[in-house]
Structure formats: structure tokens, C-alpha cells
């Protein structure tokens, strides 16, 4: 499954993914980790301008997918957390958006 080719879908009333599915999907996302019921990664940048450019581009992706991360923004880093609150845990939407976040960060 190529997460980059998928789009988020409404998750109202859905259950979180099973642990084995979470582990399998997590293995496709370098340096992401599970913290509680969130999928998290810290991205590092050279300066505030690069950090904010990334955050703004990620905001555009989140708007397109209608799935929004919690973020903590600092001078040279951004901490990105995905979780599906309606499901009370992780859904495929979180992994789709994490993959798209990775692609954004790795884009030349």
C-alpha cells in the first residue's frame, strides 16, 4: 500500500487500528514513534524561516486532507503529532498524513 496515493476519509464512529496494523504502518515511516495514542516526529531545521515554511506547507496538506496535526513550533524544529480524536487513537488517516509530511520534508 502506497500511503502517498491515498486520501483521508471521515472517521466518525470508527475504531482505532489494531496494534499489529499500527506496527506494520509505523515501519514504513522512518523516525516516527508512537507516544500514547499519537504518531509523533520532530523535524529539525536550520532556522526559524525554514521551520515556518515547513509548518505552512504542512498546514496546506492538512487542509487538503481535512486531517490536522497538533504541532509544537520552535525556532529550529517542529514537533508533529497525528491522532484521530473521533476514533480515540490512530487510524489510517494518521499514517497517510504522516507519509505526506515525510514527503514534504524530503522534497528537494
Curated annotation (Swiss-Prot):
Its EC number is 4.2.1.96. Pfam families: Pterin_4a (PF01329). GO terms for biological process: tetrahydrobiopterin biosynthetic process. It is an enzyme of class 4 (lyase). The keyword Signal does not apply. The keyword Transport does not apply. This is Putative pterin-4-alpha-carbinolamine dehydratase.
Amino acid at each position: 500500500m502506497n500511503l502517498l496515493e491515498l486520501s483521508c476519509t471521515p472517521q466518525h464512529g470508527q475504531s482505532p487500528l489494531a496494534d499489529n496494523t499500527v506496527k506494520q504502518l509505523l515501519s514504513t515511516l522512518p523516525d516516527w514513534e508512537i507516544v500514547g495514542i499519537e504518531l509523533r516526529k520532530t523535524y529539525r531545521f536550520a532556522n526559524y524561516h525554514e521551520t515556518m515554511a515547513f509548518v505552512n506547507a504542512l498546514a496546506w496538506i492538512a487542509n487538503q486532507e481535512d486531517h490536522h496535526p497538533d504541532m509544537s513550533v520552535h525556532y529550529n524544529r517542529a514537533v508533529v503529532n497525528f491522532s484521530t480524536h473521533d476514533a480515540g487513537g490512530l487510524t489510517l488517516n494518521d499514517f497517510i498524513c504522516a507519509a505526506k509530511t515525510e514527503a514534504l520534508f524530503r522534497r528537494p
